[in-house]
Amino acid sequence: MTRRPVSRKRRATHGTGPGEQSDWDHSAHKRKRLQPEKKSLVFYLKSRELKPHNDSTYLHLLRGHAACTLPGILSEREFHLGNLNKVFASQWLNHRQVVCGTKCNTLFVVDIQTGQITKIPILKDREPISGSHQSCGIHAIEINPSRTLLATGGENPNSIAVYRLPTLDPVCVGDGGHNDWIFSIAWISDTMAVSGSRDGFMALWEMTDEVVNKRDFQHGLSRVPVYSHISHKALKDIPKESSNPVNCKVRALAFNGNNKELGAVSLDGFFHLWKAEQTLSKLLSTKLPFCRENVCLAYGLEWSLYAVGSQAHVSFLDPREPPQCAKSVYCREQGSGIRSVSFYEHIVTVGTGQGALLFYDIRAQRFLEDLTGSCREGDLLKLNTGKGWLNHNEMWMNYFSDIDSCPNAVYTHCYDSSGTKLFVAGGPLPTGLHGNYAGLWS
C-alpha cells in the first residue's frame, strides 16, 4: 500500500509589517491563539546531549549553557538617541521596550524593534526647585517584584518618583528625604523602596494602598495626570567609618530578598549590610579590598554573593564569611573603572569605563576567553561598544579635538527575561563631554 502524500504547508499568518509600531493592547493579545514557543538551535542541540531527571533541572542546565555560550556570538545594533547626554540607568519593561534615564534628566522608552524613542514626563516636588539648581540626572531605575511599579528620580534629583506599570502613569513623588542627589534605589518589597543618596543617608519609602487609590480617584476626575506626594518612613545614615566623613556617600544598593538584607556601598570604600523589612537595622560594615571608585553593586541570589566594582577589580563578598575571605578579580581596565555589574546564571557581566563588556564565570573562576580565533590564545572575550554620538562642544574643542570619538563608558546594562538579549548604554567618561550610546546585543 502506498501512502498518500501529506501536505505540510500552512496558511501564512497576518502580522505587523517591518518597522511598524505596535500598541500595548493586552486584551487583543489574549484573544489571539498562542503560537508555539520557538526554541533556539542551542536549545535543541543541548537537549540531545543532556538527559536530566526533571524539567527544572533540564531548563537550569540549558540556561547555564546559554549564559556562557551566548556572549561569544552576540552582535550589536546601535540606537540613535539624538542629543541626549549619557544614559545612566535602564530596565526592560517587556520583550521589546526598555526604559532609560539620562544625565540630562530625561526619562524615555526605546522600542528595540523600531528604534523609536518616547519621552516620559518627569515628576515634580511639592515646592518648585530653585532656578540655580543643577541636576545630576537620573542615576537609578528599579522595578518592584510584581512588576507593577517603577521607581526612579524626579525633576529634583534629590527626590524619588514612582510610576505604574505597564502604563507608566505617575503614582507619587517622595520628596524632602534627601538634600543631595539620589544615586541608587532598591525595592525591598512590592510597596517599599529604599533610596541611597550622596548626602550619606538611605531613605525608606512606602507606597501604601491609600496613595495608589488616591491617585486612581484623582485621575478619574481629571484628564491631566495627577500624583501624590509622600514622606519617608525611615531615614538612616551610613556609618562614618573613615577619617573623611565627606566621602560617606551612598553610591549603590542591592537587595537580598531571601534574607531580607540590603547591601550598600559608600564612596569611602566600605560595604554596609542592613536588615531591611519594615525599617532598616544595621548588621555590619566592612572595608572593601579595593576602595577606589566603588560605584556599582549587584547581588547574585543563587551564589549568595555581592559583586562590587572598583577602579580595576570586581570583588565578591559573602556577608557570612570574614572580610579577608573576599575574592577579587582583576579586569585589566586600569584607570577607567568598573561602571556596571550584573549576575545572570553563573556569569557576571562587567561594563567598563573604556566601553568594554567582560564576562566572568563564577564556577570556573575565570573570565570567558575569546574563542573566535581572531585573537591570541588566552585573550579575554571582550565586546566593545560602538561609536555612539558625541557633541563637539567647547570641552571637546579644547581637550579632545584631535580625536573624532572616545570610548563610551558602559554605565548601565541589563538582560531581558530570556537572557538572550543584552541592552547596553552609557556615554563618554570625561565629565565635561556630552554624548550618548545605546545598543542591543543579541
Swiss-Prot record:
> Which Gene3D superfamilies does this chain map to?
YVTN repeat-like/Quinoprotein amine dehydrogenase
What keywords were assigned to this record? Cytoplasm, Cytoskeleton, Nucleus, Repeat, Ubl conjugation pathway, WD repeat
Q: What GO terms in the biological process aspect are recorded for it?
A: protein ubiquitination; regulation of autophagy; ubiquitin-dependent protein catabolic process via the C-end degron rule pathway
Q: Does the keyword Nucleus apply?
A: yes
Location in or out of the cell: Cytoplasm; Cytoplasm, Cytoskeleton, Microtubule organizing center, Centrosome; Nucleus
Q: Which InterPro entries match?
A: Beta-prop_DCAF12, DCAF12, WD40/YVTN_repeat-like_dom_sf, WD40_repeat_CS, WD40_repeat_dom_sf, WD40_rpt
Give the domain of life: Eukaryota
Task: Show me the WD repeat boundaries.
Answer: 132-173, 177-215, 245-284, 333-370
Name its pathway. Protein modification; protein ubiquitination
Q: Which is an annotated GO molecular function term of this record?
A: ubiquitin-like ligase-substrate adaptor activity
Name one cellular component (GO) term. nucleus
Where along the chain is composition biased (Basic residues)? 1-13
Q: Which Pfam families match?
A: Beta-prop_DCAF12
Q: Quick one: where's region Disordered? A: 1-31
Could you tell me what this protein does? Answer: Substrate-recognition component of a DCX (DDB1-CUL4-X-box) E3 ubiquitin-protein ligase complex of the DesCEND (destruction via C-end degrons) pathway, which recognizes a C-degron located at the extreme C terminus of target proteins, leading to their ubiquitination and degradation. The C-degron recognized by the DesCEND pathway is usually a motif of less than ten residues and can be present in full-length proteins, truncated proteins or proteolytically cleaved forms.
| Family statement drawn from the similarity comment of this UniProt entry | Belongs to the WD repeat DCAF12 family.
User: How is this protein organized at the quaternary level?
Assistant: Component of the DCX(DCAF12) E3 ubiquitin ligase complex, at least composed of cul4 (cul4a or cul4b), ddb1, dcaf12 and rbx1.
Designated name of the protein: DDB1- and CUL4-associated factor 12-B
- Which species is this UniProt entry from? Xenopus laevis
